[in-house]
Amino acid sequence: MKKIAILTSGGDASTMNKCLSTFITYASKYNCEVVFVKNGYKGIYDNEFVKPDYTETKSWWSLPGTKIYSSRFPEILDEQVRKQMVDNLHKNSIDTLVVIGGDGSYKGARLLSKSGIKVIGLPGTIDNDIASTSYSIGFDTSLNAIVNSIKEIKSCMDSHANVAMIEIMGRHCIDLTVFAGIATEADIIITPESFYTPQQLLAKINEKRKTNSRGIIILYVELLLGTENIPTVEEYIKYIQANSKESVKKNILGYLQRGGNPTAMDMIRASLMTEHALKMISENQYNKIIGVDEFKVVSYDLETAINMKNPSRKDLIDKFFN
């Protein structure tokens, strides 16, 4: 039986708990024993290895956040700190370390792998900034939270014909901003790839007014405005209001984007990736990063499409119910 340690690292993401629940549920099927590491990489250093309670962990499947907690641990860059972490993993007879986190967490896993630790990575971050997967765990939940907030803001903007500038999380990844903009039919998005100066933004707003738009929704990605000689959002608003009759309202959604109840699709993807991690461990595959590839639009001839058969779900039934 292989003993695997699981930790959640970096920023919390809804559906991390679903991963933990799935690991507990299916570990025995793959002849694995699971222990949790509290507080991310710091927990390895502090020797916070805990044996999970099966019944309690099974109840976590729909809870947001991470019940084994997370932390930032830049000390992992120190060789002596890593040596202590490796020693603690060996003392606890850990065969494979599973890291649920983002890009920074993966870099930590790579450092430990170079010290001889077998690692598996699962993409857990709302930012969707991991190039090896189309969707990261928590992204869909965060996106839905953003969409719901925009809908509520839009109704207020429509009532008064105001402009809303809404900051969206994502660090240096624009996916939440772009996808939320598509979903809500936002009027304008501001990203490094679709950038507007205050003057250009006002011109764009004026264009929208010509189409009889009332409430105007502008989404901008965080960590852009106010950096590298770019005006702050307050300076954007000041310019627009000084040079027009527009009333502009600043909104920062902040942590509302991170703590929502997991969506069904997020939980399904988390389950699929977690089960695949267990399968890989049972097959002695390690130093791997798991992801999904789903961003593809296809088309078929009419006759071909009509004659196509719906896919069998037997593989899913076998994975999760047999």
UniProtKB/Swiss-Prot annotation:
Its cofactor is Mg(2+). It comes from Malacoplasma penetrans (strain HF-2) (Mycoplasma penetrans). The lineage of its organism: Bacteria, Bacillati, Mycoplasmatota, Mycoplasmoidales, Mycoplasmoidaceae. Its main location: cytoplasm. It is found in: Cytoplasm. The keyword Nucleus does not apply. Its EC number is 2.7.1.11. The active site is at D127 (proton acceptor). Pathway: Carbohydrate degradation; glycolysis; D-glyceraldehyde 3-phosphate and glycerone phosphate from D-glucose: step 3/4. This is Probable ATP-dependent 6-phosphofructokinase. It catalyses: beta-D-fructose 6-phosphate + ATP = beta-D-fructose 1,6-bisphosphate + ADP + H(+). Belongs to the phosphofructokinase type A (PFKA) family. It holds the Pfam family PFK. Substrate binds at T125, I126, D127, M169, G170, R171, E222, K249, Y255, L256, Q257, R258.
